[in-house]
Amino acid sequence: MHASLDGFVGGPKGEMNWIKIDDELFDFVGKIVDQADVGLYGRVTYQMMESYWPTAGDKPNASKHDIEHSQWYKRVDKVVISNSMKGGKIPKVQIISGDINEGIGQLKQKEGKDILMLGSPSASHALMHHNLIDEYWIFVNPILLGVGIPLFKNIEAKVNLKFIASKVFASGVVGLHYEKS
């Protein structure tokens, strides 16, 4: 999850044009993404991803990152947290609605690699509320937004975290890795 130094993950209207992305960060995040075989999204982020990533790697001007992430996106199962998303069976997509504890609990019991949530602030807030996030990678960008969508919301009890690693990027972004202790 990208965040501003003052703790916002999006501007007041969800804007993300302030996020510093470059090849160094793409390569680093690509290694994290490769450790996952499930992409976890909120409905809005899933729809945004679905409109771009399935064909992003096929475009003539596709970057190395576009090709790699497009291949990953098409390969992995997607899980969408949504009470409003309806529709027929979508290949490689599972929708969790209603009891988020039960849905995520069942997902965590499955064999496989990591479950990775990219973005999805509303879904992240719901998972935080139920203390369902095991690890955090937060990429702090060198900007103060002042207002916007907060990184942390709906946390009702203290959650102890253990520092795992940090990474400073040439762009000024600092990656922070924590896990629940």
Q: In which residue ranges do the predicted regions lie?
A:
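Short, conserved catalytic or interaction motifs in soluble domains
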Residues: 135
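Portal/gating segments that form or line small-molecule/metal binding sites
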Residues: 1-132, 142-181
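Non-cysteine beta-strand/loop elements that form the S-adenosyl-L-methionine
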Residues: 139
